[in-house]
């Protein structure tokens, strides 16, 4: 019985008196999703083998055989020729079994001084580190596309909103740079997360470390880790880094979702501020006229998906005692899907933003509605000595009158304005209308962080310089 089990390749089979149920095999196997870790698994194994040889734990001949066998396996995987076996449960045992088949006993010595517990923790960190770097690049691409569009629209005026009500005029460039700020913070979070990802668990073995004279720091250096995990129990059981990454990814998607909501609104014929290129839209199977912004709509939906993965990982870890538990097999699919979703979304959004057509006339027309320069009139009165609360009340009265007449504040004549605001008439001169123009309103906010066109250009320049950091 034992020899038959060994032929099937189960690494623990000598301990049991009956073979594993086929149902249990399918239930516990992870190879058909964790095989994406194959190349980092090979990299980790080669670093481990090199250290074992340097420490005289395995021979130089064994190391040479392992390196030769791993090169062949890597080629098979890259060419799609590797035969993954359900019986071998996961990526680690599949590769080890193939290595042993190729090089014999030297392959059996590879696992000396390590466990799959520290092996998989190392693989995930190696893989995620690379994906964080990729996502950082994609965030830069999206930020760059937004900066380009912002620079092109530093003078384009649209209404700024609070509570989805017209508030004050802003430049479209300023509005876009708000999203650049969000995605810049996302990039910072990814960099911060990477620092905690980049610690080596290998050497912790199953949970207690190993009795072999290993050199963990040498392996860390070979694999590009900043250091080692300091506690063997924590090293094999920690998934904080995966949760932290997924939380950062959820914020990326939240920012994408907020932007998506505005894109959908702006593209609506009732608003008509922008048009999204046809290649990013779909039509209707029944309504011939439709052009639907499916990409931003789907991004809103996918945000819920990533948020769900975050909750799944938090829930996965909340009841686990030290050290490693099989529960942790469930960390990979949420993590993999989060990476795929965020990367795909960022890539398509960078391309979509570059293809947006802006409609400045529609934006300007909307900014002329809703008394968007009312605050400027109040500020005008304050600068002439009126307390702000009194100015606020006077302008609110003027807005009420104009609203009833269906006109804007700028449509009043000077005499009408003085007549409607007798208590402040002595403060109002003909220059008041300079404050009521959209251009005057945005130009007056020329301070760092303000919406004035000169500040938008300066902010865009600074944001572009930050892309390389």
UniProtKB/Swiss-Prot annotation:
Belongs to the lyase 1 family. Argininosuccinate lyase subfamily. Keywords: Amino-acid biosynthesis, Arginine biosynthesis, Cytoplasm, Lyase. SUPFAM superfamilies: L-aspartase-like. NCBIfam families: argH. It is an enzyme of class 4 (lyase). Pathway: Amino-acid biosynthesis; L-arginine biosynthesis; L-arginine from L-ornithine and carbamoyl phosphate: step 3/3. It is found in: Cytoplasm. GO terms for molecular function: argininosuccinate lyase activity. Its EC number is 4.3.2.1. It catalyses: 2-(N(omega)-L-arginino)succinate = fumarate + L-arginine. InterPro entries: Arg_succ_lyase_C, Argininosuccinate_lyase, Fumarase/histidase_N, Fumarate_lyase_CS, Fumarate_lyase_fam, Fumarate_lyase_N, L-Aspartase-like. PANTHER family: ARGININOSUCCINATE LYASE. It comes from the Bacteria. It comes from Burkholderia thailandensis (strain ATCC 700388 / DSM 13276 / CCUG 48851 / CIP 106301 / E264). The keyword Ligase does not apply. GO terms for cellular component: cytosol. One of its GO terms (biological process) is L-arginine biosynthetic process. This is Argininosuccinate lyase.
């Amino acid at each position: 019985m034992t020899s038959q089990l060994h032929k099937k390749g189960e690494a623990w089979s000598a301990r049991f008196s009956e073979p594993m149920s086929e149902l249990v095999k399918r239930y516990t196997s992870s190879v058909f999703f964790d095989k994406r870790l194959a190349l980092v698994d090979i990299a980790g194994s080669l670093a481990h083998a090199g250290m074992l040889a340097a420490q005289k734990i395995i021979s130089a001949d064994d190391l040479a055989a392992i390196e030769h066998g791993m090169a062949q396996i890597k080629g098979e995987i890259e060419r799609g020729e590797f035969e993954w076996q359900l019986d071998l449960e996961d990526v680690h045992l599949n590769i080890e079994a193939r290595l042993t088949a190729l090089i014999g006993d030297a392959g059996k010595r590879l696992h000396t001084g390590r466990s799959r517990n520290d092996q998989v923790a190392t693989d995930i960190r190696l893989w995620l580190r690379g994906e964080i770097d990729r996502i950082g690049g994609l965030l830069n691409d999206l930020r760059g596309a937004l900066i380009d569009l912002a620079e092109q629209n530093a003078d384009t005026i649209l209404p700024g909103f609070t509570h989805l009500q017209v508030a004050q005029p802003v430049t479209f460039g300023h509005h876009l740079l708000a999203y650049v700020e969000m995605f810049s913070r996302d990039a910072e979070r990814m960099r911060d997360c990477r620092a905690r990802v980049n610690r080596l668990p290998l050497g912790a073995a199953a949970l207690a470390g190993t009795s072999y004279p290993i050199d963990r720091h040498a392996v860390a250096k070979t694999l590009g880790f900043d250091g080692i995990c300091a506690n063997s129990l924590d090293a094999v059981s920690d998934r904080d880094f995966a949760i932290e990454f997924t939380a950062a990814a959820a914020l990326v998607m939240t920012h994408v979702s907020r932007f998506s909501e505005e894109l959908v609104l702006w593209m609506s014929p009732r608003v008509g501020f922008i048009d999204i290129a046809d290649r990013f839209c779909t039509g209707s199977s029944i309504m011939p006229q439709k052009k639907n912004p499916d990409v931003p709509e789907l991004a809103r939906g996918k945000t819920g998906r990533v948020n769900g993965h975050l909750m799944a990982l938090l829930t996965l870890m909340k009841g686990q005692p030290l050290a490693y538990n099989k529960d942790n097999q469930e960390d990979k699919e949420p993590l993999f899907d989060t990476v795929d979703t965020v990367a795909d979304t960022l890539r398509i959004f960078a391309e979509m933003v570059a293809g947006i057509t802006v409609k400045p006339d529609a934006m300007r027309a909307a900014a002329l509605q809703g008394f968007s320069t009312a605050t400027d009139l109040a500020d005008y009165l304050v600068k002439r000595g009126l307390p702000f609360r009194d100015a606020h009340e006077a302008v609110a009265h003027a807005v009420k009158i104009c609203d009833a007449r269906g006109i804007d504040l700028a449509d009043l004549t000077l005499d009408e304005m003085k007549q409607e605001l007798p208590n402040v008439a002595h403060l109002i001169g003909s220059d008041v209308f300079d404050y009521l123009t959209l251009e005057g309103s945005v130009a007056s906010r020329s301070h760092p962080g303000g919406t004035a066109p000169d500040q938008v250009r300066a902010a865009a320049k600074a944001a572009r310089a930050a892309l390389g950091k």
